Amino acid sequence: GEHLREAFLRSGPDMVAELDAKTAVKFAAALAHPDYVKNQPGEAFGGRALAPVAFDAKVLGDDFDRVLPPRPEFMGLGGMMVNRNELSALLRPVSSVGNAKTTLKVVLPYFKDRLKYKRGTRLVMGNALVGRLLYSLKQYQTEIWYEAPLQELLLEEGRVIGAIVDTVNGRQRIIARKGVVLATGGVAWNPALRQQYFPVGTRDYSLAPQLSTGDGLSNGLKVGAKLDNEDHPVLWFPCSTFKKPNGQMAVWPHIILDRAKPGLIAVNASGKRFVNETDSYHDFCVGQLAAQHNNASTPAYLICDDAFIHKYGLGLIMPGAQKLKHYLKHGYVVQAATVRELANKIGVDAHELEQSVVRNNAYAITGEDLEFGRGTGKMNRFNGDAAIGPNPCIGPILTAPFYA
């Protein structure tokens, strides 16, 4: 509610200042990172989002292996982390002198790291935050119990006074001097809780680590905690899945590389668009779930043409990819010579999909999306392609073959 937002705004700066002064946790403001909620009073182009400063994990010694790596799909060359600005350069390393310099600056140290480490030691984003927090705890000589899952919260006269955890040395009873903080992750891999709390169509996959089984939530509810009734109490990402040859399931979030770029639309089982594809990943899914009440929108399909997929990529298919046979063979993407044929292959209404493409192509000329306002707001346009006009988020779907 409002009081929680006020508490966050009031206390957030104090938290950042204290971490900066007393720990190795350092943040930098993202100068170009528009607000996700658009057309609101005070909307800003950047400066609000804070990102952890890149961290050299070599200082962790053997504890570096305790930092859970990102999903394999998120790392380049088998173990290299990059931030968003670097990613743009690495995707087109020879397009400019600046891109070439950035690529060499990132790639050469990585190859040196791999002579000794299982992956690159330069951590960015969430991994950098975890690494900096762990290093700070080590500097303060804080005792950390690994492999010690929570089993039960201890209650005395209606107040939580401690916890029981399983450790490598057996079950331990811990009495807290001040309080117990539940920081055990969400419920992403708890089938019963997902079935209870998540909408239909969102219960199968997650980007969260598989250790996120809702232990904190379950134990909190047992001692009288209450779960609020917010409409969307989780973070949604539109994802595609691909079963790898080794049997593992790759889950790819469609965040910035494809969904917001000109020349792509998202449609439901009726072949109709249902949302502004360029809105934030969370808002995209909120719109998708809302549309589910009228038309089957989970799963949905991303539709593009040959020119788009080679310029921007599509999900796991990176920009510039020349060979799509592997992805076609395993059904990650579907290819067709015409939009109607594509509709028939994926099982959506062919006439409606054709009309959705016709309308999109008209919007590409006028620069105005009359259905969902695609390309309005700072964030929409920032994630588009500034070289395309009149709207950086809308482009024609014309060049066969077509893909879903």
Residue ranges and their predicted role:
Residues K38-G46, V53-T102, L217-N219, V223-V348, ...:
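An anion/pyrophosphate-binding glycine-rich loop and adjacent beta-alpha core
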Residues F55-P72, V106-K178, G214-V223:
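Helical element adjacent to the flavin cofactor pocket in flavoenzyme catalytic cores
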Residues E152, E156-R159, E352-A404:
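A glycine-rich dinucleotide-binding beta-alpha-beta segment and adjacent secondary-structure elements
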